[in-house]
Amino acid sequence: MNASPPVHPQTETPGLPGVSFGTSADGMPVALVGDTAFAMAKARDGRRYLVTAWRLSKPMGEWTRDDFYGHSGERADEAAFRARVLENAEHQHEKRALSRHEICSRASTPWGASQGATVYAEGVTSHSTAGHGGFKLSAERNRKVHPMLRSAGGWYEEDAAWAIVAITFPHLFTAFERRCAERTVKDSWPDAWEAIFGTILQPGESHEKDRRSFEREHADHWVVASAITSKHEPGFVEVVATLGGKRGAGTEERRFLVPSGEYSIG
């Protein structure tokens, strides 16, 4: 008598068509949003990570860890995994409702020749190149950007400056994109954020503002600039420290041995 194959139930999420959750062949929590597959994979150290794949042809119950290649950060538990999947589903649903459309483009950009572009609205275009990309705003659109954040040429690269476009024209972006943009502008341009929105960012709300505070408070302290496990003194970490953590030619350095058990990164 043949044993019955394992059952891997798949559930559709009410209110969000096209979102399904299930279990992979090797026991991972998995999900499908449109053509994007998600899984919560366990690493050797026991931590769990969100991994992704695109257009898997197999049924969800036949997926395995080897099918996934994208890495999207650590997740604490299955609840956090499901929350991230639903956030992505909301993002994709909202994006379909926007009037973005793809066009062929060979425009010259600061990052090389455009290999394609997405038009968000008249005068707001995102270009992709071989190595980078970003937004180009028309002169009229660019005048709407706050002077503290405005790029003279109307180009805004995709790593951080894209967020300037998003907070200037929020109606062209999804809720997820707007949240990411808010975080990016606070972290990178806190002075502009405070001026535009009439608020004061508190400790922990801006990487850049926190960095400045740290440098002021520790300007006269020896701050670790680099560290390696010592090859000469087992059980110790060799650290290089500079005043205020400054770097560059001519900066005075001091070297210390710190017991490995007492050294922590942070």
Each model region followed by its residue ranges:
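Ubiquitin-like/PB1-type beta-grasp interaction modules and other compact soluble beta-rich domains
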Residues: 195-232, 240, 256-258, 263
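Short, compact, well-ordered microdomains
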Residues: 66-80, 159-203, 256-266
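A solvent-exposed interaction/effector surface
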Residues: 117-118, 125-129, 143-152, 180-203
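Surface-exposed beta-loop interaction hotspot
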Residues: 75-116, 197-220
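Charged, low-complexity intrinsically disordered regulatory segments in eukaryotic signaling
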Residues: 106-137
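Short, charged/polar micro-motifs that form catalytic or ligand-binding hotspots
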Residues: 151-159
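A short, structured beta-strand/loop element
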Residues: 127-150, 244-255
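N-terminal accessory interaction module
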Residues: 6-90, 225-266
